[in-house]
Amino acid sequence: MFKGSCVALITPFTEDGVNYEELRKLLEWHIKNHTDAILVCGTTGEGSTMTLEEKKEVIKFSVEVVNKRVPVIAGTGTNNTKASIELSKYAEEVGADMVLIITPYYNKTSQKGLYAHFSAINDAINIPIMLYNVPSRTGMNITPLMLDKLADLNNVVAIKEASGDLSQVAKMAELCGDRIAIYSGNDDQIVPILSLGGAGVVSVLANILPEETHNICEKYFLGEVIESRNLQLKYLSLANSLFIETNPIPVKTAMNLMNFNCGPLRLPLCEMEDSNLIILEENLKANGLIK
């Protein structure tokens, strides 16, 4: 387990595949800038448009480069339970520290099926599981009562909570906050979720502000709550600009503007609208990230 900021890392692409040279640079940059954990092949990493072999290679490569300096979390969840088990087993074999398992999307399921999905994955592996709740993308919600039940599974240790509903997060903390670590899945709610006993954030913002996102959490944990809150508010407009279009379109665009060689987005993701690009550039300039 970790406390603090986990970057939901973008995946740098070339026209033909993954840019491993740039990926290595990004991994080292995050460790140097105090990122507390690294998630690969998640939503921000465009995992849904990577091939199975690409995901396996990125997980293996990242584990080897990071070499236990910080935890590496592998995004292995899909809407196919069998496929999720296969990739989770692979992540365990190559030394990932945790897997991130999203709720089934598109085909979705019932609450009974949701429990069966996570339970089957839990029983097939021996590695910590972080659940991922993002109803806006999946059409499914892990309710507080369901989380209370899932928290009893032996490998389920955490949840990335991106419902945006602080009342729901509070109920989760009340029911099972002593058995499961709750991480904010939204950069605009880091401090509010920390105030409910949260353990940190799985962050898009950390792709461009790794140390600052770490500091929001670190200062809170040190009891410097006002300083933590001030940082949350300082970067609020920038964080919001990263969601002006579908994530990870803005953050990958931002990183390329910042002279990281992150390459293209994969269809169906595409270049930003000019009007939104102007807003993103203004926020990057305001924070000294581009000239």
Swiss-Prot record:
CDD domains named in the record: DHDPS
Keyword ATP-binding annotated: no
Gene Ontology BP annotations: diaminopimelate biosynthetic process; lysine biosynthetic process via diaminopimelate
Superkingdom of source: Bacteria
EC number, as in UniProt: 4.3.3.7
Binding site for pyruvate: 44, 202
Record-annotated site: Part of a proton relay during catalysis: 43, 106
Catalyses which reaction(s): L-aspartate 4-semialdehyde + pyruvate = (2S,4S)-4-hydroxy-2,3,4,5-tetrahydrodipicolinate + H2O + H(+)
Catalytic site positions: 132, 160
Keywords associated with the record: Amino-acid biosynthesis, Cytoplasm, Diaminopimelate biosynthesis, Lyase, Lysine biosynthesis, Schiff base
Major subcellular site: cytoplasm
Pathway noted in the entry: Amino-acid biosynthesis; L-lysine biosynthesis via DAP pathway; (S)-tetrahydrodipicolinate from L-aspartate: step 3/4
SMART domains (UniProt xref): DHDPS
GO molecular function, one term: 4-hydroxy-tetrahydrodipicolinate synthase activity
InterPro entries referenced in this protein's UniProt entry, alphabetically: Aldolase_TIM, DapA, DapA-like, Schiff_base-form_aldolases_AS, Schiff_base-form_aldolases_CS
Entry keyword annotation includes NAD: no
Cell location: Cytoplasm
PROSITE patterns: DHDPS_1, DHDPS_2
An example Gene Ontology CC term for this record: cytosol
Assembly information from the UniProt record: Homotetramer; dimer of dimers.
Function: Catalyzes the condensation of (S)-aspartate-beta-semialdehyde [(S)-ASA] and pyruvate to 4-hydroxy-tetrahydrodipicolinate (HTPA).
Family the entry assigns: Belongs to the DapA family.
Protein name (record): 4-hydroxy-tetrahydrodipicolinate synthase
Organism: Clostridium perfringens (strain 13 / Type A)
Lineage of origin: Bacteria, Bacillati, Bacillota, Clostridia, Eubacteriales
